[in-house]
Amino acid sequence: MRSGVIAQKVGMTRVYNDAGEHVPVTVLRMDGCQVVATRTVEKNGYTAVQLGAGQAKVKNTSKAMRGNFAVANVEPKAKLAEFRVSEDNLLEIGTELKADHFAAGQLVDVTGTTIGKGFAGAMKRHGFGGLRATHGVSVSHRSHGSTGSRQDPGKVFKNKKMAGHMGQTRVTTQNLEVVSTDEDRGLILIKGAVPGSKGAWIIVRDAVKSAAK
């Protein structure tokens, strides 16, 4: 098990394959992705690497974090993430990961925070059909209807699909294909959509279920 990477979402475009078919891709850019710290079994009880990416202003970095970056001899990072790795894949502090960490055709799992939509109704949030447009229905055309309870059990069960805050949740999309990489510009092109807005930080790992596919 090896480390993943931290990348920033640039946006979407399309590329053409050898058959002349266009493939929609999401462009991810790697910006100074370095190993900031390591975790070992002897000291921490598990093996992992902590990566940092992007650039943070020194004045916006806490004194404790400035000390950590100074020990690692790296510039302050805007985003940190920890990856569990096997002992033989433990990287040295200061090691920089490039876009060629992944290969074209490889499957990856991508984690990001979805775009927030605010407070949304049941029709938009869960795809409910709503009530009738006429025949006695007034005001409640887009309501979710009954919450499905009576004297017993006398409550609404948890996780009942209702109106509420939509989006802005941490989501992992599995088994996305790496179309190509550009080491010089630090770009990774991934087939399909990736959760998050433009400029969002994205975690990219080797797919864990690719063997089943």
From Swiss-Prot:
SUPFAM superfamilies: Translation proteins. Pfam families: Ribosomal_L3 (PF00297). This is Large ribosomal subunit protein uL3. The keyword RNA-binding applies. One of its GO terms (cellular component) is cytosolic large ribosomal subunit. Keywords: Methylation, Ribonucleoprotein, Ribosomal protein, RNA-binding, rRNA-binding. Belongs to the universal ribosomal protein uL3 family.
